[in-house]
Amino acid sequence: MTKVGLRIDVDAFRGTREGVPRLLEILSKHNIQASIFFSVGPDNMGRHLWRLVKPQFLWKMLRSNAASLYGWDILLAGTAWPGKEIGHANADIIREAAKHHEVGLHAWDHHAWQARSGNWDRQTMIDDIARGLRTLEEIIGQPVTCSAAAGWRADQKVIEAKEAFHLRYNSDCRGAIPFRPLLESGNPGTAQIPVTLPTWDEVIGRDVKAEDFNGWLLNRILRDKGTPVYTIHAEVEGCAYQHNFVDLLKRAAQEGVTFCPLSELLSETLPLGQVVRGNIAGREGWLGCQQIAGSR
């Protein structure tokens, strides 16, 4: 039996309003629990369009057929009009998710975090995280115990900033196994549970065809030598490609692969490491990457 952490990122208004209820129904039918990370502030995802001037981002949008993948409402959100606030407008959906699944913070403003947090000072970052946590806690009526940085935009500054909130774990980076990042003080910080597997949009049209994706992914899962963690998006697997996700769950069960919330992957003893800026194929710009202590 292979256990895989299932992380669901919710980036936009439509992903919350339409994608999450569909995913909740699918997961219930398959008796699966996951970790769902919500963006709760304004939906400004359309402001990423300026990145089309960057060849790598443009190619990603073209090969993944972004217009049909996400929909024009997501691709234009927050451009010609102010972005709609996601959290309180979809409070019932978020509360329903929290009844059955582990719920954490993805971002207050997903676009702002992904586009600008790398240049924020620590206090600006702390204030932004606090705003998101406060809003999510108001909605679900209980403490939030985990978070996942939008776009995996995380480095040492993010690690230090999140220590102020005493969360159980964060999932801010890409890597191989859960670990504790070393703080500037020399002490171990809050546990990190890295994502180990590629997302749909990172590989479709580059490494694999859409119709071959599930078999390709299951092969990666079964060959994973670390602690497999897979991320889906409410805007993708909860909308245009929900049928692919259902097929993945059926095929996974046949292969002896089970999915679980990320917290089930934690252990009492974890190795030490760091989160450093790096790059991965299929994703434009830098993101947080796991570096085990002592490695280079």
From Swiss-Prot:
GO cellular component, one term: membrane
Highest taxon listed in the record's lineage: Bacteria
EC number: 3.5.1.n3
Keyword DNA-binding assigned: no
Transmembrane portions of the chain: none
Every NodB homology domain range: 2-260
GO molecular function: hydrolase activity, acting on carbon-nitrogen (but not peptide) bonds, in linear amides
Pathway this chain belongs to: Glycolipid biosynthesis; 4-amino-4-deoxy-alpha-L-arabinose undecaprenyl phosphate biosynthesis; 4-amino-4-deoxy-alpha-L-arabinose undecaprenyl phosphate from UDP-4-deoxy-4-formamido-beta-L-arabinose and undecaprenyl phosphate: step 2/2; Bacterial outer membrane biogenesis; lipopolysaccharide biosynthesis
PROSITE patterns in the cross-refs: NODB
Record field: catalytic activity: 4-deoxy-4-formamido-alpha-L-arabinopyranosyl di-trans,octa-cis-undecaprenyl phosphate + H2O = 4-amino-4-deoxy-alpha-L-arabinopyranosyl di-trans,octa-cis-undecaprenyl phosphate + formate
SUPFAM superfamilies per UniProt: Glycoside hydrolase/deacetylase
Keyword line: Antibiotic resistance, Hydrolase, Lipid A biosynthesis, Lipid biosynthesis, Lipid metabolism, Lipopolysaccharide biosynthesis
Gene3D superfamilies to which the protein is assigned, alphabetical: Glycoside hydrolase/deacetylase
GO BP, sorted A to Z: 4-amino-4-deoxy-alpha-L-arabinopyranosyl undecaprenyl phosphate biosynthetic process; lipid A biosynthetic process; lipopolysaccharide biosynthetic process; response to antibiotic
Keyword match Lipid metabolism: yes
Similarity comment: family membership: Belongs to the polysaccharide deacetylase family. ArnD deformylase subfamily.
The protein's role, per its UniProt record: Catalyzes the deformylation of 4-deoxy-4-formamido-L-arabinose-phosphoundecaprenol to 4-amino-4-deoxy-L-arabinose-phosphoundecaprenol. The modified arabinose is attached to lipid A and is required for resistance to polymyxin and cationic antimicrobial peptides.
Matching HAMAP family: ArnD
Protein name, entry field: Probable 4-deoxy-4-formamido-L-arabinose-phosphoundecaprenol deformylase ArnD
Gene expressing this chain: arnD
